[in-house]
């Protein structure tokens, strides 16, 4: 019943109220003063209800994508969402509520991390002062547009908001407790079983190197552990270490590198940070462990190994497809098919990239692809 809780269908919503409403991201819906609402209207004078609903929907989609990525990533995302919801509850109970689109309030309220970093105990009140200082700085710099970054009190919100937050927190906590006890992940098991016989099949993987993409850092870390357990040398790249590891990437995976080639690593496992702007074409096998949010990224990922200068005759692309339940919510398969079909039509591509259905798909391309990117997408990696 996990999907029913995190992303119910309209029919399921009629049968039960036990599903997440993502109220942590809907505070602006509950302002009592219309003047505060006007600070947060969207483009085209969209009301706060529409803005909040869109943000909540993005967080819902992200949670579904984390579930599709790996059970480890999903469980960690539940833990994060529980903490973020608890932060809002704590602000309410302390009568100090921050709504700050330009400030990472959840990061600022992580007093345990701040205590470790500063080497002295940091309290909730210390964190509050940090946020106030950031708001003041934004205002002084003329960057606090319409006063969107502001501090409020309980009286500025409808009382029902607190009740809804508590209900969300209960559902998230119960779901997390269940998933924290679940060691099974069939997708991950299938990956481990196919590392050597399929991904390193010498008849296909003639380069002896492999590129793996995933959007979730927790998934990347799990994949790295599995690859290393099979005896392969894995290089893990995220935004945190991309720059410092650039030379290592070139030495081990760039077929155009003019220096001495190295084989310190035969697998590179990365997030979207390497989806563009880098050569990885000493490898000729790529695995998309999860399908990217923007289907154009799929082509960009594959373009890392399918490049001029490759020494291998063929490139092999493997994809883990989303489940039917998950894709009913995020529609990644449909968007990927549509975008890739448009490439085939426009550029005469004759290689099937995502599935056998590509050459016969005839969706309304403009309708399916339009709106993939959201102005609120900056929030989606929060989980």
Task: Name what the model sees in each region.
Residues 310-383:
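C-terminal accessory region of SF2 helicases/translocases
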